[in-house]
């Protein structure tokens, strides 16, 4: 991150500490009930309590209640106008990211925080949550935005100045940080320094691949294209650990109780919505939409309907739009 003015930096630091605290609470929720090291999940916040507390909204309900942009906000010939006329928001992302964007095999619907946000943006522009997913990886996200294959990328996409040279970012809309995933039986790795001398999996072209060189320079790094390949390397014993954004790793641990997330996040990973480069009107529009759903509580409702169904605690503080270098 580049240096920022003291006032802005202080605000961001406070918000980051809140986000780290919330992330720590989420990680603790996955492991707190297992005295022998195994993980167990808290009960879903969507269930009624003994006192008759009403069930939380579902993702579909949150999206259905989301706002629609006024006609005056969509100018003729703009990025938004083209999407509205087409009737579908074409999204780059994944269908295998637990808690963020994962396809439900029973319904064939995409579920998760990123998936829900893309549906809410589609509704804001079009009036209905019509999206079309094209699968992307860390290697193809910029290219797909540059060649017009997708309108936007929702993919736990960390904002960096280097990436911002190729694409624009709206946001940040969520803050995470690099963390460590290991087998639940592993009690020797708890912090980045413990990775030195170990074999560590991560995604190629990810910020984590660069972070490992800084925080664990003696680690042997195995690079893979996708999250699932990194998880398999750990479960099969080819890697001792897997380093990536904590939000993604928590989802992996939810899916596979033989895994656990250890320690605290040791970097800042602000997620942004990838947009075509040099379209300030599109970026301003999406930033304004994010501010709207932050302020009216729709962002928090979506968090509760997605991530909050798997982990305990309140939604984290919303990031400051434009606070990340590159946003």
Segments from the language model and where they lie:
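C-terminal motif of bacterial Sec signal peptides marking the signal peptidase cleavage site
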Residues: 28-32
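Extracytoplasmic small-molecule ligand-binding "clamshell" domains
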Residues: 46-48, 52-57, 62-153
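A ligand-binding cleft/hinge motif common to bilobed small-molecule-binding domains
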Residues: 156-165, 213-214, 235-268
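Periplasmic-binding protein-like
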Residues: 174-182, 250-290, 310-327
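Bacterial signal peptide processing site
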Residues: 34-37
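Extended ligand-binding regions for polar small-molecule ligands
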Residues: 51-74, 186, 206, 273-311
């Amino acid at each position: 991150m580049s240096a920022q003015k003291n006032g802005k930096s202080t605000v961001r630091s406070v918000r980051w500490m809140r986000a780290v605290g919330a992330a720590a609470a989420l990680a603790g929720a996955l492991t707190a009930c297992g005295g022998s090291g195994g993980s167990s999940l808290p009960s879903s916040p969507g269930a009624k309590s003994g006192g008759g507390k009403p069930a939380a909204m579902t993702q579909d309900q949150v999206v259905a209640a989301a706002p629609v942009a006024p006609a005056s906000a969509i100018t003729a010939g703009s990025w938004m106008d083209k999407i509205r006329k087409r009737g579908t928001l074409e999204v780059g992302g994944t269908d295998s990211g637990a808690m963020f964007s994962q396809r439900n095999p029973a319904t064939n619907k995409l579920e998760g925080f990123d998936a829900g946000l893309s549906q809410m943006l589609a509704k804001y522009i079009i009036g209905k949550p019509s999206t079309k997913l094209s699968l992307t990886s860390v290697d193809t996200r910029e290219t797909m935005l540059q060649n017009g294959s997708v309108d936007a990328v929702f993919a736990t996409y960390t904002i960096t100045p280097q990436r911002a040279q190729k694409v624009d970012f709206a946001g940040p809309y969520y803050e995470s940080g690099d963390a460590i995933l290991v087998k639940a039986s592993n009690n020797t790795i708890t912090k980045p320094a413990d990775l030195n001398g170990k074999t560590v999996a991560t995604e190629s072209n990810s910020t984590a691949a660069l972070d490992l060189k800084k925080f664990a320079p003696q680690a042997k790094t195995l690079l893979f294209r996708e999250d699932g390949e990194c998880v398999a390397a750990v479960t099969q014993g080819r890697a001792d650990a897997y380093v990536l954004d904590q939000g993604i790793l928590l989802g992996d641990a939810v899916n596979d109780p033989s895994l656990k997330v250890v320690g605290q996040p040791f970097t800042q990973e602000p997620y942004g919505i990838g947009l075509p480069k040099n379209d300030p009107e599109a970026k301003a529009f999406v930033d304004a939409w994010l501010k709207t759903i932050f302020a009216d509580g729709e962002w928090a409702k979506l968090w509760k309907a997605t991530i909050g169904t798997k982990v305990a605690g309140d939604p984290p503080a919303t990031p400051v739009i434009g606070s990340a270098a590159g946003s």
